[in-house]
């Protein structure tokens, strides 16, 4: 059985929510398609003197609520369809947590593990030059995503600033603190996932001190989530990377796992725990499964065998639409990605505000604001879920996001 791709999944999720909201047909049609997508070819001189050309994209999905906001990812599977879906999800995410942003996403088709630091820098600067007429502190503000980091954002900011003739730190978020980044941004997505997981346990009357948690992915998001949940008393029984997963039913020592990964290039292979496959991890009998890797890992086949009590989506689009239907039929709650991983864009917003005001906040204030916004959005989702008798948490979240986006279009009208 061939399952739908990320863009089809996103549109199907919208369609499910439409039944519960009153949206003008014309506005709904506008919300289904990106406002614009740029495709660029990036010639880069490699370290050996050869020239390689990379395909890249920037999709701007919707700007009714404010400037476009969304990350830049480097991965071999990047495609126009993928960035369009991710830009759409970012639109609903910013609306759900009530940030004054729209949604965007960019990406370069490449394998950064096969590139030197110099080649990645040249590729980043070439990409920035290619999209610089689209981005800006009041138009489109990029951020890190898969395989990009604060250093990458520093190169984007510097390249854009050179063209402007002065420093423009607010053109990107997720920068190093030394050039205008905010403390707490690197950990923000994982911290947000841990906050939402705590709220989810409380809602379903699960004691976090007795909770078993499996996390697919041990990159920036998965590792921070594991560390923070472990600090709160949760039992992290499995984590994974691209080589496979490690499992200990008595609970992994997350600090030790992190130290091992740091010493082995981020790899978990060889760690002193039971090696299992990523598929095995996804079907463990746990209180919470947290997919924190890539899209479409929970397929129909996985959903039929899944034994977790609840899923908290740390990755973007980890559950296919058809798999979500299976989980709904089985009564397995899924806390959607547009809420669970919104911590990153919330703190990106706080960084952008600080840059615009030229006034910095301490990390305690940033984390307080993050928690307040996430718990508020979680409560709003629950109110919609219960009061409107909506069948899933995802659809409840989408009703809020669609209503806010549609209201913005309604007030702004159509020009000309």
Swiss-Prot record:
It holds the Pfam family ELFV_dehydrog. Its EC number is 1.4.1.-. GO terms for molecular function: glutamate dehydrogenase (NAD+) activity. Gene3D superfamilies: Leucine Dehydrogenase, chain A, domain 1 (3.40.50.10860), NAD(P)-binding Rossmann-like Domain (3.40.50.720). The active site is at residue 105. InterPro entries: Aminoacid_DH-like_N_sf, Glu/Leu/Phe/Val/Trp_DH, Glu/Leu/Phe/Val/Trp_DH_C, Glu/Leu/Phe/Val/Trp_DH_dimer, Glu/Leu/Phe/Val_DH_AS, Glu_DH, NAD(P)-bd_dom_sf, NAD_bind_Glu_DH. The keyword tRNA processing does not apply. Keywords: Oxidoreductase. One of its GO terms (biological process) is glutamate catabolic process. Strain NRC-36014 contains 4 distinct glutamate dehydrogenases while strain NRC-1 contains only 3. Belongs to the Glu/Leu/Phe/Val dehydrogenases family. PANTHER family: GLUTAMATE DEHYDROGENASE, GLUTAMATE DEHYDROGENASE 1, MITOCHONDRIAL. Homohexamer. This is Glutamate dehydrogenase A2.
């Amino acid at each position: 059985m061939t399952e739908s791709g990320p863009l089809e999944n996103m549109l199907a999720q919208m369609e499910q929510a439409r039944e519960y909201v009153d949206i003008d047909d014309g506005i709904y049609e506008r919300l289904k398609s990106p406002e614009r997508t740029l495709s660029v070819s990036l010639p880069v001189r490699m370290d050996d003197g050869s020239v390689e050309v990379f395909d890249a994209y920037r999709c701007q999905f919707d700007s009714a609520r404010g400037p476009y906001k969304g990350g830049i990812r480097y991965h071999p599977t990047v495609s126009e369809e993928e960035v369009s879906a991710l830009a759409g999800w970012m639109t609903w995410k910013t609306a759900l947590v009530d940030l004054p942003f729209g949604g965007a996403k960019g990406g370069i088709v490449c394998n950064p593990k096969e590139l030197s630091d110099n080649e990645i820098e040249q590729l980043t600067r070439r990409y920035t030059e290619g999209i610089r007429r689209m981005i800006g502190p009041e138009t489109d503000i990029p951020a890190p995503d898969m395989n990009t980091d604060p250093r990458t954002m520093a190169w984007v900011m510097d390249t854009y600033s050179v063209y402007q003739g002065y420093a423009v730190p607010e053109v990107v978020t997720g920068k190093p603190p030394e050039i205008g980044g905010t403390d707490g941004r690197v950990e923000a997505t994982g911290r947000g996932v841990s906050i939402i997981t705590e709220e989810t346990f409380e809602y379903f009357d699960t004691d976090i001190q007795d909770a078993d948690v499996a996390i697919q992915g041990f990159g920036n998001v998965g590792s921070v989530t594991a560390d923070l949940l472990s600090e709160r008393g949760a039992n992290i029984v499995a984590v994974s990377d691209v080589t496979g997963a490690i499992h200990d039913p008595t609970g992994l020592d997350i600090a030790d796992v992190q130290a091992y990964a740091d010493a082995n290039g981020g790899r978990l292979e060889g760690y002193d725990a039971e090696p299992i496959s990523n598929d095995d991890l996804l079907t463990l009998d746990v209180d919470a499964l947290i997919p924190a890797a890539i899209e479409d890992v929970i397929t129909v086949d996985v959903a039929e065998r899944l034994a977790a009590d609840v899923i908290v989506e740390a990755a973007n689009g980890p559950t296919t639409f058809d798999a979500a239907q299976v989980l709904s039929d089985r009564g397995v709650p899924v806390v959607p990605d547009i809420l669970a991983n919104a911590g990153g864009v919330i703190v990106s917003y706080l960084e952008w505000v600080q840059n615009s005001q030229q006034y910095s906040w301490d990390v305690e204030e940033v984390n307080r604001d993050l928690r307040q916004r996430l718990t508020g959005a979680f409560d709003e989702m629950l109110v919609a879920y219960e009061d409107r008798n909506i069948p899933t948490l995802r659809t409840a979240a989408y009703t809020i996001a669609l209503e806010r986006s549609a209201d913005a279009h309604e007030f702004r009208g159509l020009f000309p």
